[in-house]
Amino acid sequence: TLAGKYRKMHIPDDPGFYEKFYFTPGDIGFRPVDTSVGRLGVLVCWDQWYPEAARLMALAGAELLLYPTAIGWDPADAADEKTRQRDAWVLSHRGHAVANGLPVLSCNRVGHEPSPLAADRVAGASGIDFWGNSHVLGPQGEFVAEAGTGPTLLLAEVDLGRSEQVRRIWPFLRDRRIDAYGGLLERYLD
């Protein structure tokens, strides 16, 4: 049985992820999927970087934000650059959890995928190392469970009732100044 559908809204076009050549952005918006475990706000891969997407899922009644993804780095990147990339990824998820008072569950691919492009291989690019580090965050951005860089079955209990408790402490959704956010609909502001 199909519980629902979601079409990836943001399509990347950066080294190693030239998806705009193959995919068209989704056209059904940000709608949570009702399941037996709760209302799931699914944001696929690149969508997870956009706080607006997480917020729209929260406003539509999502009880959990789910981020299935395949993200990694060029193996030739310096160690400190790799750390910055992975830390920014986790930090954005923690920010989404806090800003929306929702648990965030992120599963990421692991392993190495060689570049399919002959030109990359000639230039010395070997492909992408997917960094794993799947995690479950509570509604205050705290780690509930975290995987390493290898294949892992990650299990965690998530208390959906905590979201309401956190939203009473931090009523960010209630206190939004929606009258002042018109500029978010513009590409740039003067």
Give residue ranges: language-model regions:
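Residue-level signal for alpha-helical context at structural boundaries
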Residues: 24, 111, 115, 158-159, ...
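Active-site beta-strand termini and strand-to-loop segments that position acidic
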Residues: 33-36, 139, 158
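Catalytic cores of transferase enzymes with a strong primary signal for eukaryotic protein kinases
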Residues: 5-29, 33-38, 48, 54-57, ...
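Cysteine/selenocysteine-centered motifs that mediate thiol-based redox chemistry or coordinate metal-sulfur cofactors
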Residues: 25-60, 163-190
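CN hydrolase (nitrilase-like) catalytic-core segments centered on the catalytic cysteine
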Residues: 45-154
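Basic phosphate/pyrophosphate-binding loop/patch that engages nucleotide-derived ligands
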Residues: 1-2, 38, 95-96
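A structural microfeature
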Residues: 2-4, 145
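A short, polar/charged loop-to-alpha-helix boundary motif
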Residues: 7-22, 152-169
